[in-house]
Amino acid sequence: MLPPLLLVTDRHGADRPLSETVRAAVAGGARFVWLRDRDLDAEARRALARDLIAILAPVGGRLVVGGDPDLASEAGVQGVHLPGSAGIDGIRALREKLGAAALIGFSAHSVAEIAAAEAAGADYATLSPVFPTASKPGYGPALGLEALRAACTASRLPVFALGGIDGGNARACREAGAAGVAVMGGVMRSLDPRSETVRFVAAIA
């Protein structure tokens, strides 16, 4: 079973080095991290991935890297999170490349995409944007809790609610059937990421 809080990295939003922000979040209970920061060059991203693995390993945490199976293999990352643009064929190709043990996530933006991701062999998916958010422009209006509930009902795939998640709505996402919530700005931009993570973990427990 995957931890119910998926922490999404954003070094531009953090007020300290990203590794320090993640370390603080892990101290607050984060056990599942998605390394995005796709604008880094390959070597810098590889080094960052290794730093995050070192932070997560002592607590049995898991790291997935956004859209880069080669980096996952080189850095020893447990899995890859694919963008929606990769499509269903991308999930199948990645499974063939990485094998059955790899953790594969997928960014979905509709109920139909959740069902398709399950059929293609993904291990989990994010559904976004559930709520209005400045972090996820370009994906249309917020889907809302009813779409989240429909996605969770229609599929056995663990679904993580993403987009506009905060301490006031995280619990509602779980009650709608989500396996968890994916949070970026709520923790990355916090002046106290440890305490903010503690609050999120408590809200969705």
Where are the regions that the model predicts?
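Active-site phosphate/pyrophosphate-handling residues
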Residues: 70, 146, 182
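A short acidic, helix-capping loop that chelates divalent metal ions and anchors anionic groups
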Residues: 35, 131-137
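Conserved N-terminal beta1-alpha1 strand-loop-helix module at the mouth
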Residues: 1-89, 95-123, 150-159, 166-171, ...
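Substrate-recognition "cap/lid" segment bordering the active-site pocket of phosphatases
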Residues: 136-142, 147-149
